[in-house]
Amino acid sequence: MRVVIQRVKGAILSVRKENIGENEKELEIISEIKNGLICFLGIHKNDTWEDALYIIRKCLNLRLWNNDNKTWDKNVKDLNYELLIVSQFTLFGNTKKGNKPDFHLAKEPNEALIFYNKIIDEFKKQYNDDKIKIGKFGNYMNIDVTNDGPVTIYIDTHDINLNK
């Protein structure tokens, strides 16, 4: 599992409105956060629940904010901030051959949706239902992000030994 975590002052996620023509570009906002983290989540075809729990723990507990006296001392929960979790299979785009990305390492969409929903439920269970916002799985999304720092962290559970 891969996650790109960005510390943000705000993020707005929009999708194309339902019931409009294919050529229309009108968007509607479905998720918005103020201070917090945007987490772009890629699910590998071989990911397990242990991978998910590791990513959830890191997203909720990484100390990415300063305290009055210490740097890198507070996490999203300490500050009662929000998270926007966005499924992004393109994190497993392989570009080793040619110029067209190959996404065969990403989990199959139907299976990924079930796993993603379980991950979101666990985020809400471990933190606060009202503080977890999501994108729309499998849809085109427009995301406006105001980075804070910038602070960007990349985690790949396949780089870590999770008792595999």
Swiss-Prot record:
Keywords: Cytoplasm, Hydrolase, Nucleotide-binding, RNA-binding, tRNA-binding. It comes from Plasmodium falciparum (isolate 3D7). Changing residue 150 to A: Loss of deacylation of D-tyrosyl-tRNA(Tyr). It comes from the Eukaryota. GO terms for molecular function: D-tyrosyl-tRNA(Tyr) deacylase activity; Gly-tRNA(Ala) deacylase activity; nucleotide binding; tRNA binding. It is an enzyme of class 3 (hydrolase). A Gly-cisPro motif from one monomer fits into the active site of the other monomer to allow specific chiral rejection of L-amino acids. InterPro entries: Daa-tRNA_deacyls_DTD, DTD-like_sf. A motif (Gly-cisPro motif, allows the protein to recognize chirality of D-amino acids) lies at residues 149-150. Belongs to the DTD family. It holds the Pfam family Tyr_Deacylase. It is found in: Cytoplasm. Its main location: cytoplasm. One of its GO terms (cellular component) is cytoplasm. One of its GO terms (biological process) is tRNA metabolic process. This is D-aminoacyl-tRNA deacylase. SUPFAM superfamilies: DTD-like (SSF69500). Homodimer. NCBIfam families: D-aminoacyl-tRNA deacylase. It catalyses: glycyl-tRNA(Ala) + H2O = tRNA(Ala) + glycine + H(+); a D-aminoacyl-tRNA + H2O = a tRNA + a D-alpha-amino acid + H(+); D-tyrosyl-tRNA(Tyr) + H2O = D-tyrosine + tRNA(Tyr). The keyword Secreted does not apply. The active site is at 90 (nucleophile). Changing residue 112 to F: Loss of deacylation of D-tyrosyl-tRNA(Tyr), loss of deacylation of glycyl-tRNA(Gly), not toxic upon overexpression.
